[in-house]
Amino acid sequence: MATIKDVAKMAGVSTTTVSHVINKTRFVAKDTEEAVLSAIKQLNYSPSAVARSLKVNTTKSIGMIVTTSEAPYFAEIIHSVEEHCYRQGYSLFLCNTQNDPEKVKNHLEMLAKKRVDGLLVMCSEYTQDSLDLLSSFSTIPMVVMDWGPNANTDVIDDHSFDGGYLATKHLIECGHKKIGIICGELNKTTARTRYEGFEKAMEEAKLTINPSWVLEGAFEPEDGYECMNRLLTQEELPTALFCCNDVMALGAISALTEKGLRVPEDMSIIGYDDIHASRFYAPPLTTIHQSKLRLGRQAVNILLERITHKDEGVQQYSRIDITPELIIRKSVKSIL
């Protein structure tokens, strides 16, 4: 691998001159500059990123810590983050924790050693222990993206209550009165607020919620599949079902199909998130859209602002608002 000394020797100049050409830090005669650039090209020379980072105190890199990158919703946010980082000239180090506190600690230490310019942390919930751990790395500019009501993090307000209300109201407006729900774990903020939106829409329409049609999953396709199979053992079935994310809707549709039932002819289903694959479900899924693209971009922009002003003292926490929108496809039928 070529070094700066090799470039200087081929161009017949000093290493200092080569450095000035690369970094554009001083005027260099045109002939000399061309000789240096020609030597760089011939030798396929690439300046040492490590040495450069030590000199300018920046690595043009960002670390991102996530619970998982497998879930489609989070994967689409991560894609948006990576794309926006790339466009801004930053590399992204992605670390999956799988909710393991030891992995979180090890990843933070590794990213600190790599001298990343900033950190994005994206988990659906945070314990006090995890917040205390993050605070011990507070010298690194950081955006902690939280869906919960935490006072010590940046807040992502995805208006889950409004989204749950919107999904249920659409089913009601299509004539459905017997409506079930597969929600997430109700001790989690996102799941609970979507369920509360469902409750509000049912209450406004003076419809009774059948407790047997309220099933709790964990936002995985297996949960939708298992919950639907439990639902299908009941004597009376709902005409419509609100699945609180798209992958649980996929599992529910799979279970229905195995029993010879059809969506929406035998049961209407509405999802939540509008993941990319939802338009290719059979049938294409009516769902609630959340802009993962905008969420990723805003998070990166907030972090870049903190990196730029990191020497100006404590930064105020930010709020990212994501407005839910109804996307009508073909998985809900009108029975008016």
Curated annotation (Swiss-Prot):
UniProt free text on domains: Consists of two structural and functional domains: an N-terminal DNA-binding domain, approximately the first 60 residues, and a larger C-terminal domain, approximately 280 residues, which imparts the function of corepressor binding and oligomerization.
Source species of the chain: Haemophilus influenzae (strain PittEE)
Name of this chain's protein: HTH-type transcriptional repressor PurR
A molecular-function term among this protein's GO annotations: transcription cis-regulatory region binding
Keyword tags: DNA-binding, Purine biosynthesis, Repressor, Transcription, Transcription regulation
InterPro entries according to UniProt: HTH_LacI, LacI/GalR-like_sensor, Lambda_DNA-bd_dom_sf, Peripla_BP_I, Tscrpt_reg_HTH_PurR
Binding residues for hypoxanthine: 73, 188, 190, 219, 273
Start and end residues of each HTH lacI-type domain: 2-56
Annotated pathway: Purine metabolism; purine nucleotide biosynthesis [regulation]
Chain residues forming the annotated DNA-binding region: 4-23, 48-56
Subunit details: Homodimer.
GO terms classed as biological process: negative regulation of DNA-templated transcription; purine nucleotide biosynthetic process
Cross-referenced PANTHER family: HTH-TYPE TRANSCRIPTIONAL REPRESSOR PURR-RELATED (PTHR30146:SF148), LACI-RELATED TRANSCRIPTIONAL REPRESSOR (PTHR30146)
Role, per record: Is the main repressor of the genes involved in the de novo synthesis of purine nucleotides, regulating purB, purC, purEK, purF, purHD, purL, purMN and guaBA expression. PurR is allosterically activated to bind its cognate DNA by binding the purine corepressors, hypoxanthine or guanine, thereby effecting transcription repression.
